[in-house]
Amino acid sequence: MSLINKEILPFTANAYDPQKDEFFEVSDENLKGSWSVVCFYPADFSFVCPTELEDLQGQYDKLQELGVNVYSVSTDTHFVHKAWHDHSDAISKIQYTMIGDPSQTITRNFDVLDEELGLAQRGTFIVDPDGVVQAAEVNADGIGRDASTLVHKIKAAQYVRQHPGEVCPAKWEEGSETLQPGLDLVGKI
């Protein structure tokens, strides 16, 4: 089932804030009012996951400049996130919120729960300030994601939101031409 153009479902969970080195409660309301990235991954203390989360951290400053809040989510607890942050060279660099979802509520809400394993799949979602999913990417377990493409998608989503009636073509870059769908373009692209 696609979540595109659907509002995120309610949730409440415990999270770890690496910048403040503290635990706090987070909910779907935290994702509203600004752009958000929600990055699901299978498990802490694993193999591909730390490479993806470190790569996401490498784009964190760019995402912050775009006004984007970043959340990583796995079915581990917030306590395990803290332990992983304290012991992994890659994860110790992370500055964004790490949400624990041991109840699998959020993972189910975003339709990325591997029911057989009880773990999240590799899913990334861009959520607009209204709490509506604008983009989604879900990969097989052995395929890591590239956070630089995420920045590109967010810029396009933000542009389209700010410019109703325009769409961003393939390989669109900030400042390049967009399209205005209409009869005059039919068959001319």
Swiss-Prot record:
Keywords: Antioxidant, Cytoplasm, Disulfide bond, Oxidoreductase, Peroxidase, Redox-active center. It catalyses: a hydroperoxide + NADH + H(+) = an alcohol + NAD(+) + H2O. It is found in: Cytoplasm. Pfam families: 1-cysPrx_C, AhpC-TSA. Residues 2-159 form the Thioredoxin domain. One of its GO terms (biological process) is cell redox homeostasis. Its EC number is 1.11.1.26. It comes from the Bacteria. The active site is at C49 (cysteine sulfenic acid (-soh) intermediate). Gene3D superfamilies: Glutaredoxin. The keyword Oxidoreductase applies. The keyword Disulfide bond applies. Homodimer; disulfide-linked, upon oxidation. 5 homodimers assemble to form a ring-like decamer. The active site is a conserved redox-active cysteine residue, the peroxidatic cysteine (C(P)), which makes the nucleophilic attack on the peroxide substrate. The peroxide oxidizes the C(P)-SH to cysteine sulfenic acid (C(P)-SOH), which then reacts with another cysteine residue, the resolving cysteine (C(R)), to form a disulfide bridge. The disulfide is subsequently reduced by an appropriate electron donor to complete the catalytic cycle. In this typical 2-Cys peroxiredoxin, C(R) is provided by the other dimeric subunit to form an intersubunit disulfide. This is Alkyl hydroperoxide reductase C. It comes from Staphylococcus saprophyticus subsp. saprophyticus (strain ATCC 15305 / DSM 20229 / NCIMB 8711 / NCTC 7292 / S-41).
